[in-house]
Amino acid sequence: MKMATPETLKKEILSASLDERLKKAYVTEENVKEQYDRYINLLNEFEALFGKNRDVRLFSAPGRTEVGGNHTDHNHGRVLAAGINLDAIAAASKNDENIVRVKSEGYSMDVVDATDLSVNPNEMGHSPALVRGVLAGFKKYGYKIGGFDATTASRVIAGSGLSSSAAYEVLVGTMVNYLYNDGKVDAVTIAKIAQYAENEYFGKPCGLMDQMACSVGGVVTIDFNDPKNPVIEEVD
């Protein structure tokens, strides 16, 4: 979505001028209306923490469901997976401090120095590791990174089997993509960066299905015969 102050974005949400964009994530008009309070609360939280006169963008990354092929991704097999309309959302704005601050609903604020991309053993298993890992992944692939402030909220519940960590990784990756790379990084690369963050920084071995489904969205088949270059096809 376009960049604007939190107050401007709130007015656009309440006036229904963003409904067509929101339908791409939430499908029906009824579902879209249910999201209004969610996004308004997210922007209110951003204003309270980071100020009212910031240029802010809104972001979303879905959870995923596996239709077929559980664990076949890391066995070089095929999977059928889908993004769902339970998602993680964020309001984010660049800063010039090279510091990333992320306040997620229900959690304390994560603060990560974007100039220190080394693996921190004390962060393993915790969300700052995912933020640092995503930043490191973008750097590894030759893309720009920098500081930003963000508030997030998620309906992809941890432990629900809908890939809450992958949704969060992809959400952070999407923020870095649009805040610092003009949206030029493709969904497959964001998924690979998210997997890198989870494997190397969070300390959890995983295949690529979760991140790929969250990043690409929709219903997709993914052939992992060559795990570094999976073949993705949309299913109508």
Residue ranges: model-predicted function:
Residues 2, 75, 178-236:
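ATP-dependent small-molecule kinase catalytic core of the GHMP/sugar-kinase superfamily
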Residues 60-62:
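Short Gly/Ser/Thr- and Asp/Glu-enriched loop/turn motifs at secondary-structure junctions
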Residues 70:
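Redox-cofactor-proximal catalytic regions of oxidoreductases
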Residues 81, 89-91, 219-221:
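Conserved hydrophobic/aromatic beta-strand scaffold that supports enzyme active sites
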Residues 2-58, 86-193:
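Anion-binding (especially nucleotide phosphate/pyrophosphate-binding) glycine-rich loop
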Residues 76-83:
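Short Gly/aromatic-enriched secondary-structure transition segments
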